[in-house]
């Protein structure tokens, strides 16, 4: 599986050119993209500026010598490459399995070309088998949990290996919703954002331009149909 992820990540790095501002994604597939950017800077003299989507990616990028800027210090991002946990035929997706969904969405928003890199197991007919992460402020989180429960969304607080509640880079909690199937991702996204205490959700609807899918037969590109 790592070989497929590496294939997708390295392929995506081919979209990066000199002088670009590049969004650096988080997760096991985006990791290989960031590594390849680091290699190209070192071996080819590639000149780019990175904008990271998590403290984890910041640490990786700094270790590779990738120059970084805050999302607040740039006008726009030329290309962002990130992973996804599920992608449907309309290229809506679920992200946030690594807990970085808020920063990932903040970086995706000013991005001109937004690309996901996945292995073929992430392409699904309908979203929802993967639990949907919802980032919530700590204050009142238990009330939100009960609200989700009353809606039949089967919530669970994300926890660390030690059993403590997982805290995001932005110091929020994550409640994962076990929905099974999501019939209308856009309506659900709107509903969640309207709930007081919800900071962000892991539905990325209509945001991505292309998805690089690595499978046993190589790499294919799936693009949004006009």
Swiss-Prot record:
Membrane-crossing residue ranges in chain numbering: none
Key words of the record: Isomerase
Name listed for the protein in its UniProt record: Ribose-5-phosphate isomerase A
PANTHER family membership: RIBOSE-5-PHOSPHATE ISOMERASE 3, CHLOROPLASTIC-RELATED (PTHR43748:SF3)
Residues forming the catalytic site: 104
The family this protein is said to belong to: Belongs to the ribose 5-phosphate isomerase family.
Pathway: Carbohydrate degradation; pentose phosphate pathway; D-ribose 5-phosphate from D-ribulose 5-phosphate (non-oxidative stage): step 1/1
EC number: 5.3.1.6
Catalytic activities: aldehydo-D-ribose 5-phosphate = D-ribulose 5-phosphate
Subunit structure: Homodimer.
Pfam families membership: Rib_5-P_isom_A
Record bears the keyword Transmembrane: no
The protein's role, per its UniProt record: Catalyzes the reversible conversion of ribose-5-phosphate to ribulose 5-phosphate.
Top-level EC class: isomerase
Record: residues binding substrate: 26-29, 82-85, 95-98, 122
Lineage of the organism: Bacteria, Bacillati, Bacillota, Bacilli, Lactobacillales
Superkingdom as given in the UniProt entry: Bacteria
NCBIfam families: PRK00702.1, rpiA
Keyword Isomerase found: yes
Coiled coil region boundaries: none
One GO MF term attached to the UniProt entry: ribose-5-phosphate isomerase activity
Entry's Gene Ontology BP terms: pentose-phosphate shunt, non-oxidative branch
Species per Swiss-Prot/TrEMBL record: Streptococcus thermophilus (strain CNRZ 1066)
């Amino acid at each position: 599986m790592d070989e497929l992820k590496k294939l997708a990540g390295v392929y995506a790095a081919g979209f990066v050119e000199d002088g670009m501002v590049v969004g650096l994604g988080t997760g096991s597939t985006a990791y290989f993209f960031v590594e390849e950017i680091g290699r190209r800077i070192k071996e080819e003299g590639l000149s780019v500026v990175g904008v990271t989507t998590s403290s984890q990616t910041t640490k990786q990028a700094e270790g590779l010598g990738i120059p970084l800027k805050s999302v607040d210090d740039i006008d726009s991002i030329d290309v962002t490459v990130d992973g996804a946990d599920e992608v449907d035929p309309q290229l809506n997706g679920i992200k946030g399995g690594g807990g970085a969904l808020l920063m990932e969405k903040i970086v995706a928003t000013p991005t001109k070309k937004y690309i996901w890199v996945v292995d073929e197991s992430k392409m699904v007919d309908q979203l929802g088998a993967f639990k949907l992460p919802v980032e919530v402020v700590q204050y009142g989180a238990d009330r939100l949990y009960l609200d989700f429960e009353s809606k039949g969304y089967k919530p669970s607080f994300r926890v660390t290996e030690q059993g403590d509640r997982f805290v995001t880079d932005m110091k929020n909690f994550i409640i994962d919703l076990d929905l099974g199937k999501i019939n209308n991702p856009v309506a659900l996204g709107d509903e969640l954002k309207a709930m007081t205490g919800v900071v962000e959700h892991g539905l990325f609807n209509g945001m991505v331009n292309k998805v690089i899918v690595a499978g046993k037969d190589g790499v294919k590109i799936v693009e949004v149909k006009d």
